């Protein structure tokens, strides 16, 4: 399997990498949160742009991105607008969503973008091509905060992301039972062993799914999300606890 390298970080080998999400509604809070996050132990900074109030002002959005880049220059920066339909804070049109991601790509300030699989096939393919032309990696994602589909469907979605040339396919699902967590883990393992030619990220959410956030190295998930302050999704644990467990499992 090929790995993905962003700055000096190699994703897809060794212990799962830790991603933290920064959620701030204005530039002042972006600045203060960035200073607080700078001391935390993580690998990738995800900026959840759907929490930012002044979305219609692209200059304001990019000014905030510049603050993050300058405050933590060594950390890979993942630009994510999570749509309302997949659990995000704001609803915007597909056109606005694509334009926002294109602006991030063109800015030269971000290393990675999150692109939702179900945005529309043509728009997704075009945006991936645009990102790659600017040496920006694409995490292609799908989130279901209500249920966990069958393993075959999970694998089909991840394979579709791979066929669209996502650098890292990602899926996050809500379990209704412990067996749903096993479904996610089994699908992850099958994808990793039989189909994946690049790193994937998978997780089962809420308290029920916490094991999936810790056992990525065993089953084939290359990264996991931790919390510096407020969790960006149900079931996230603190980065310090997360690093401890990931290290124990890696060294066992």
UniProtKB/Swiss-Prot annotation:
SUPFAM superfamilies: Aldolase (SSF51569). It is an enzyme of class 4 (lyase). 3-dehydroquinate binds at residues 21, 46-48, 82, 213, 232, 236. Keywords: Amino-acid biosynthesis, Aromatic amino acid biosynthesis, Lyase, Schiff base. Disulfide bonds: none annotated. GO terms for biological process: 3,4-dihydroxybenzoate biosynthetic process; amino acid biosynthetic process; aromatic amino acid family biosynthetic process; chorismate biosynthetic process. This is 3-dehydroquinate dehydratase. It comes from Shigella boydii serotype 4 (strain Sb227). The lineage of its organism: Bacteria, Pseudomonadati, Pseudomonadota, Gammaproteobacteria, Enterobacterales.
